[in-house]
Design a protein with these regions (language model features):
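Radical SAM/AdoMet-radical enzyme domain recognition
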Residues: 1-144
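Residues that scaffold the ATP/ADP-binding catalytic core of kinase and kinase-like folds
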Residues: 41, 64, 68, 212, ...
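Short, surface-exposed amphipathic charged segments that create phosphate/polyanion-binding patches used
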Residues: 138-139, 181-186
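C-terminal accessory region of radical SAM enzymes
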Residues: 143-182, 208, 213-259, 265
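Radical SAM enzyme core and accessory elements
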Residues: 163, 204-212, 217-221, 225, ...
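Short, P/G- and charge-enriched loop/turn segments at secondary-structure junctions
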Residues: 185-190, 244
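Short, small/polar residue-rich loop motifs at catalytic or cofactor-binding pockets
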Residues: 194-198
């Protein structure tokens, strides 16, 4: 599968010819869009060219979504985009980031996923990259995962029962009690910690190749397809072979001593790099949060250095390990057994 992302892919002149070329080479084609410029007419050429699926972000209720997207009216336009695409015959899906602004709105997002006939819902944690790098208070703290994951497991079960694929992203994990449920479609459910350079690659607009489209450009480009064959970049580039060729010495901090180190390999490379400047130590791990919690501890990330302002930029954070103090937990899952209705 080839997924066209942006910016907005449909703003590129002749982008439907790219879709046709993808389909002519025997690959399926999906599009991820912000959903802000999609009219009733615009999905029709995409459907005719062969776009099979369109994914639109829904990041909470109207106020939260518009705040996160920094665009008044973005929520209404995103929902309209889902409706327009379905009318054109394109299957639709929703993707959502999870952070402290929408942590308690996941049930409401799930209702919209069902109401708009979506075939899938991808979930990932907000990472401090791009605009999010400038708003550290929006991020979840690692200890929030202890209470978040049971909610995700309940929603996964409820939507799966209604034939909606709930797809936790590569930075939602790892090795906790719900991992097999989340990754049941994989041959090895615990092999989903990072797909970069293993089952995924990213092609930037200028032809640069990365193991994952989310990774920063600096340090993670393995070559350019204008200069080298894609297969040569894939096989020979150190940047793309990083997760394929596991070396225990690359792991550090908690991940370096973890029981699951060899299988997990430090979790999502993008998340760790965006937080700490290098991969190999990822505090956003369910097993890790549970391990600390059982010992009366928790981890907190604190921004040390602001982002530079460049594309794919990120700041730097420190990890603080501290005792769990009495504090109001964020609102627990209020509906542990409530079924979502269409």
């Amino acid at each position: 599968e080839v997924t066209l992302i942006g910016g907005e892919a449909y703003l590129f002149p002749g982008w439907t010819e790219i879709v046709r070329a993808i389909r002519a080479h025997g690959m399926s084609c999906a599009v991820v869009s912000g959903g802000q410029g999609i009219t009733e007419e615009s999905p029709r050429p995409a459907a005719e060219a062969g776009v099979e699926s369109l994914s639109i972000p829904i990041d909470g209720d109207a106020a939260t979504h518009d705040r996160l997207r920094a665009k008044p009216g973005a929520y209404a336009r995103a929902l309209a985009a889902l409706r327009h695409a379905r009318l054109a015959g394109i299957a639709v899906a929703v993707n959502s980031q999870i952070n402290r602004l929408n942590l308690h709105q996941l049930d409401a997002i799930a209702e919209q996923v069902l109401a708009h006939g979506c075939h899938g819902w991808q979930l990932q944690l907000t990472v401090p990259a791009g605009r999010a790098a400038d708003e550290p208070d929006v991020l979840l703290q690692p200890y929030d995962l202890v209470e978040l994951f049971p909610v995700l497991a309940r929603l996964h079960a409820q939507l799966s029962a209604q034939h909606v694929k709930v797809l936790p992203g590569n930075n939602v994990g790892y090795f906790g009690p719900f991992e097999r449920q989340f990754r049941q479609s994989l041959r090895c459910p615990n092999d989903a910690s990072c797909s970069a350079g293993r089952s995924v690659l990213g092609i930037e607009a200028n032809g640069d190749i990365k193991g994952c489209p989310s990774l920063p450009t600096r340090g993670w480009v393995g070559g350019n397809v204008r200069d080298h064959r894609l297969v040569d970049i894939w096989e020979r580039s150190e940047a793309l072979r990083y997760t394929r060729e596991h070396r225990p010495e690359r792991l550090w901090g908690f991940c370096g001593t973890c029981y699951y180190a060899d299988a997990c390999r430090g979790g999502c490379t993008w998340t760790a790099t965006s937080l700490l400047g290098r991969p190999g130590n990822n505090p956003y791990c369910h097993h890790r949060a549970l391990d600390h919690h059982a010992r009366g501890l928790r981890e907190r990330v604190v921004q040390r250095e602001a982002a530079s302002g460049e594309p794919f930029d990120h700041g730097l954070f420190d990890i603080v390990v501290e005792a769990i103090e009495p504090r109001p937990a964020f609102v627990p899952d209020p509906h542990p057994s409530t079924e979502i209705s269409t």
